[in-house]
C-alpha cells in the first residue's frame, strides 16, 4: 500500500501529456496527489527528496481490458471470479468481485500500470466492466467512476482448415447467433417501455 506524506522527485526527465518533455524536472506529490510538475519547482519544506537523475517519469499506463483482481491462481477455481453462470447477465458487476489484496495488483502497479478496466468473461452479455485504480483497500476505494456493459459478439465463421462445416451450416450458425442478439434487444425494448410506463418501479428478473 502507498505511504502518505510529501515527496519530491527531482532531476528526472518527465514525459507529460500536454506539456511535452521536461528535462531535469521535479514532481511534487502530497498526500497521494501530484501537486506540481516542472523544471523550476520549489521543494516544500519537510518533503522527502528522491533523486531521480537519469530516470524517466511518465503518467501511469492504463490497461484497456483485463481480469486483474478477478483471478488469482489459474489451477484453483476458488480464486476465479470472472465468469458468472448464464449467457445474459449484464447486471453482474465486475467491481463487486475485485479482490484488492490480489498479489498481481501491486506487481502490476510497480510496473507502471496504475489503472485497468476489469472485464467479466463468458457468455453473450457476461456482465458490466469497471474501471479501477490499482490503489485502495476496498473495491469502492479503487473504483475510477466508469462502467460499461460487455457484449461478446458471436464468432461463427470458419475457424481454420479443421472446420469441416458446410457453407450452409455456417450461415445457419450466423443467423442463430444474430437472432439471439435481436431477441435480447427486443426484450430490452419491452422492459424499457414497461419500466417507463410504471415510472421506474418494475422489478428486474
Predicted regions and their residues:
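Metal-associated gating/positioning segment near the N- to mid-region
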Residues: 55-111, 116-119
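Histidine-rich, glycine-flanked metal-binding segment
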Residues: 14, 18-58
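Second-shell loop/turn segments in exported
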Residues: 17, 92-95, 167-171
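N-terminal helix-cap/turn-to-beta initiation motif at the start of protein domains
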Residues: 1-7, 43-44
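Polyanionic/metal-chelating signatures
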Residues: 104, 109-205
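Structural motif
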Residues: 6-7, 48, 60, 114-117, ...
